[in-house]
Amino acid sequence: MIKNEQPPLSFEEAMEQLEEVVEQLEQGDVPLEEAISMFQKGMNLSKVCHEKLATVEKQMDQILKEDGNFEETVLQEEQE
């Protein structure tokens, strides 16, 4: 891992940060330039959450496939 590179966020961490961004933007007292930056951060966090949910959905489908036989296969998390 590169020095400045942060480890990937968990779903819960991304949701918490996204909720904070939304709350700040909803207050409406953020300068325009900062609001645009926050909006972009929120969109990125939303993408992280969506990707993690999609990965979990694929794992659940894999577990429940083939006539209800419970067969778990761990899938690699999709990377950009």
From Swiss-Prot:
A GO MF term: exodeoxyribonuclease VII activity
Protein keywords: Cytoplasm, Exonuclease, Hydrolase, Nuclease
The protein's enzyme class: hydrolase
One Pfam family per UniProt: Exonuc_VII_S
UniProt GO cellular component terms: cytosol; exodeoxyribonuclease VII complex
Localization (cell): Cytoplasm
Any one GO BP annotation for this protein: DNA catabolic process
EC number(s) stated in the UniProt entry for this protein: 3.1.11.6
Catalytic activity: Exonucleolytic cleavage in either 5'- to 3'- or 3'- to 5'-direction to yield nucleoside 5'-phosphates
InterPro entries registered for this protein in UniProt: Exonuc_VII_S, Exonuc_VII_ssu_sf
Family to which this protein belongs: Belongs to the XseB family.
Quaternary structure (record): Heterooligomer composed of large and small subunits.
General function of this protein: Bidirectionally degrades single-stranded DNA into large acid-insoluble oligonucleotides, which are then degraded further into small acid-soluble oligonucleotides.
Protein name: Exodeoxyribonuclease 7 small subunit
